[in-house]
Each structure stands twice: as structure tokens, then as C-alpha cells.
Curated annotation (Swiss-Prot):
GO terms for molecular function: identical protein binding; structural molecule activity; virus receptor activity. It comes from Bos taurus (Bovine). Can form homo- and heteropolymers with other CLDN. Homopolymers interact with CLDN3, but not CLDN2, homopolymers. Interacts with MPDZ and PATJ. Interacts with OCLN, CD81, CLDN4, CLDN6 and CLDN9. PANTHER family: CLAUDIN. Residues 29-81, 140-163 are extracellular. Residues 192-211 are annotated as: Disordered. Keywords: Cell junction, Cell membrane, Disulfide bond, Membrane, Tight junction, Transmembrane, Transmembrane helix. It is found in: Cell junction, Tight junction; Cell membrane; Basolateral cell membrane. This is Claudin-1. The chain crosses the membrane at residues 8-28, 82-102, 119-139, 164-184. Belongs to the claudin family. The gene is CLDN1. Disulfide bonds join 54-64.
Length: 211
């Protein structure tokens, strides 16, 4: 029988990772303005996300501008958007599939083997979801690093990692860990050998041997 505690732990971790991926996708702080130069004025903070760019003044006023043109966006941003949305949708599917296969649920109690397969299948989908989120955040982060160390990039146009990017990395890790625990909650099949049956001994001959 599947380990109910391991299943529940994996599901909770993966679910938290899915929530984190939604938060990361919605937040505009994927990259924040770098203050590496001493000549940069710190009266305002500039940051960008997947859907908008914002400017926060020292007075507390925040102004955001949504990216209107899809074709005007660079390929990295478009790919990151697509991978994050795919990861969120896959995570939603994994939640429904894994819920059916959980030991604590009453669904499919008459078919224990099918119930375990559903839990493992949900874990596999969580793994794919976490991988998509990890690729998206790593790709976007690599682009930030390349632009930061590019000598052609002006000092006043360099960005660093934002909070949303760290949340995305944490979300991907939780989805991968939770999916792996769900997959490991399925017990290994034990090979059963047939019980040997005793053969009847031949009855002793009562007749005499003749030459």
C-alpha cells in the first residue's frame, strides 16, 4: 500500500510550489534596477516583470506600464511567459490528478492499483511543471547576467535579479521535490513465487519380484 504520509507531504510541497509559480508570474519584480554605480540617483526604483514595467518613487507613488505590443518583446521574455503559463496549467492538471490518487481521498477505493497509478501520474506532471518553471526562470536569469556584464550595456541600464525570480526558483524546487515524493510513494512490486506443492510418494510394491 502507498505511504499516505509521503503522499500528503509531496502533494503539499508541490501545491505550495504551484502557488509560488502563480505569484512569481504575476509580480513585476523579475529584474530590478542596479545601483552598482555611485552616480546613480536612488530616489526611484525601477523594475520589470513579464507583463509590465514599474517605477517606484521615494514618496511611495508607483507607476506601471503594461507591455502593449507582443511582437515588440524580445524572444527571452516571450519564451519565459509561455513556459511559466505552461507550468501553471500543468500544475493545475497535476493537482486534480494527484488528488484522485491520494490515499486520504475516497475516490477509486475499489481499485487500489489504479489509484496508486493516478498519484504517480500526478507526480510526473508536477515534475514536468517544475521543470518548465525552472527552465523559464533560469533562462530569464541568464539573460539578466549576460546584459549586466555586457560592456556594451550602459551602466544606467543594468538590472539585477528581482524578488519574483527568487520566488520562481523556490516554486520550481518545491514542484520538483513534491512531484518526486509523489512518484516515490508508490510501493515497489514484490516478486511472488508459487508455493511448492509436495508430490505424493509412490506406494511401496507389495508383490514379489520374479526372475
Amino acid at each position: 500500500m502507498a505511504n499516505a504520509g509521503l503522499q500528503l507531504l509531496g502533494f503539499i510541497l508541490a501545491f505550495l510550489g504551484w502557488i509560488g509559480s502563480i505569484v512569481s508570474t504575476a509580480l513585476p519584480q523579475w529584474k530590478v534596477y542596479s545601483y552598482a554605480s555611485d552616480n546613480i540617483v536612488t530616489a526611484q526604483a525601477i523594475y520589470e516583470g513579464l507583463w509590465m514595467s514599474c517605477v517606484s518613487q521615494s514618496t511611495g507613488q508607483i507607476q506601471c506600464k503594461v507591455f502593449d505590443s507582443l511582437l515588440n518583446l524580445n524572444s527571452t521574455l516571450q519564451a519565459t511567459r509561455a513556459l511559466m503559463v505552461i507550468g501553471i496549467l500543468l500544475g493545475l492538471i497535476a493537482i486534480f490528478v494527484a488528488t484522485v490518487g491520494m490515499k486520504c481521498m475516497k475516490c477509486m477505493e475499489d481499485d487500489e492499483a489504479q489509484k496508486m497509478r493516478m498519484a504517480v501520474f500526478g507526480g510526473v506532471i508536477f515534475l514536468i511543471s517544475g521543470l518548465a518553471i525552472l527552465v523559464a526562470t533560469a533562462w530569464y536569469g541568464n539573460r539578466i547576467v549576460q546584459e549586466f556584464y555586457d560592456p556594451m550595456t550602459p551602466v544606467n541600464a543594468r538590472y539585477e535579479f528581482g524578488q519574483a525570480l527568487f520566488i520562481g526558483w523556490a516554486a520550481a524546487s518545491l514542484c520538483l521535490l513534491g512531484g518526486a515524493l509523489l512518484c516515490c510513494s508508490c510501493p515497489r512490486k514484490t516478486t511472488s513465487y508459487p508455493t511448492p506443492r509436495p508430490y505424493p510418494k509412490p506406494a511401496p510394491s507389495s508383490g514379489k519380484d520374479y526372475v
